[in-house]
Amino acid sequence: MKLSMPRFDQAPVLVVGDVMLDRYWHGGTSRISPEAPVPVVKVDQIEDRPGGAANVALNIAALGAPASLVGVTGQDEAADSLANSLQAAGVRSIFQRIAHQPTIVKLRVMSRHQQLLRIDFEEPFATDPLSLGEEVEGLLEGVKVLVLSDYGKGALRNHQALIQAARQKQIPVLADPKGKDFSIYRGASLITPNLSEFEAIVGRCADEAELVAKGLKLLEELDLGALLVTRGEHGMTLLRVGHPALHLPARAREVFDVTGAGDTVISTLAAAIAAGEDLPHAVALANLAAGIVVGKLGTAAISAPELRRAIQREEGSERGVLSLEQLLLAIDDARAHNETIVFTNGCFDILHAGHVTYLEQARAQGDRLIVAINDDASVSRLKGPGRPINSVDRRMAVLAGLGAVDWVISFPEATPENLLRQVKPDVLVKGGDYGIDQVVGADIVKAYGGTVKVLGLVENSSTTAIVEKIRKH
């Protein structure tokens, strides 16, 4: 299944559900309390993040999709914090504020990236389902997907009215379910329970075959369009009537914190479907997104560049011949891992042993090596008629096959100065016997604090000499 980045900017999504504030107290621990055998945390940072349905909306907006949110809060500073954070993220939020009842707050005490304690401040909201439904119906115009983010806190009480209102407008409804009665989601386009939520409804599943059988039965009983069971380290399983089960393995490189992973799944699904992706592709994108977000601390969102880089890794474009856009994203990812970027350039018309040795030496100057080559017209201007011997596509393909080379890109000018201004490598490398100040682009790299190095060339290795020798014979 080939993946590509959807046009999220054309994918408006409406989220309705239980909003909450995830509050974090960060601090150091160096002693045990004399009052009880518990650690003493000296708080030095307080952080607020949107949680629940608000985190779903935040994730959708972070992908670049227009996001609207309807929910219930108290009339307090926690609601104000939520509203401010969502506004800053570009989410349009409409809160039904209830007097004399607090906004739901999940307070986590953190030390050294570990959660020591969670304290919940909440009372289920006894909202009037008609009032919330009226807010939603007025917002459905122009929306491409409706998400029901249900945490069982009271904001969603008339699920069927919302589902039917969306279906009448042919708007897909995605629901992240809670509780032991999934019949309230009857008629939804897709529900996304995790494995424990799913087994609470259908009973324990001994293997995948039983999971599929019970899932298909649930689909038919509830008239669901599809069922996606998220299974932690075992990945995800997508079930649809009339289609084979689709099992996707987990994509996480490192699991650091699973808080909010379900929110990331449904938000990526919603944005992708709203952008016109079919369901299997949307699920594959959601699986990639979940693999990224579990590597972050606490409730977190995945950004469009992060998802784009994950797609590139999935499609094998993490190395090799890249476009400028792909290269800049790959560089961002490498720098996020504190990797040093090395850049060299040339025509590389006929690759020989001298080139290979030089590129290995260049690669040793850092962690990632970019090789930029002159395109065919540029080589012809530099070397004269009859050059290049090999086309730019062939030259790039050969270079990309070398173990020392990470990324290959071409440029049309005589020199790579324009490319250097955009790439901004940490190290510019050139082969030859001239001074550093004579290296083309040295002034550009040195101006932003980069390093320029000149490496010696292997003797008796020259493309021009090889070409002349061939012509004489």
Swiss-Prot record:
Reactions accelerated catalytically: D-glycero-beta-D-manno-heptose 7-phosphate + ATP = D-glycero-beta-D-manno-heptose 1,7-bisphosphate + ADP + H(+); D-glycero-beta-D-manno-heptose 1-phosphate + ATP + H(+) = ADP-D-glycero-beta-D-manno-heptose + diphosphate
GO MF annotation list: ATP binding; heptose 7-phosphate kinase activity; heptose-1-phosphate adenylyltransferase activity; phosphotransferase activity, alcohol group as acceptor
Known pathway: Nucleotide-sugar biosynthesis; ADP-L-glycero-beta-D-manno-heptose biosynthesis; ADP-L-glycero-beta-D-manno-heptose from D-glycero-beta-D-manno-heptose 7-phosphate: step 1/4; Nucleotide-sugar biosynthesis; ADP-L-glycero-beta-D-manno-heptose biosynthesis; ADP-L-glycero-beta-D-manno-heptose from D-glycero-beta-D-manno-heptose 7-phosphate: step 3/4
Active site: 263
PROSITE patterns on file: PFKB_KINASES_1
Alphabetically ordered keywords of this record: ATP-binding, Carbohydrate metabolism, Kinase, Multifunctional enzyme, Nucleotide-binding, Nucleotidyltransferase, Transferase
Disulfide bond residue pairs: none
Source domain of life: Bacteria
GO CC annotation: cytosol
Chain positions recorded as ATP binding sites: 194-197
InterPro entries: Bifunc_HldE, Carboh/pur_kinase_PfkB_CS, Cyt_trans-like, PfkB_dom, RfaE_dom_I, RfaE_dom_II, Ribokinase-like, Rossmann-like_a/b/a_fold
Entry's EC annotation: 2.7.1.167, 2.7.7.70
GO process terms (BP): ADP-L-glycero-beta-D-manno-heptose biosynthetic process
Stretches for region Ribokinase: 1-318
Matching Pfam families: CTP_transf_like, PfkB
Record-stated family: In the N-terminal section; belongs to the carbohydrate kinase PfkB family.
Function: Catalyzes the ADP transfer from ATP to D-glycero-beta-D-manno-heptose 1-phosphate, yielding ADP-D-glycero-beta-D-manno-heptose.
Protein name: Bifunctional protein HldE
Gene this protein is translated from: hldE
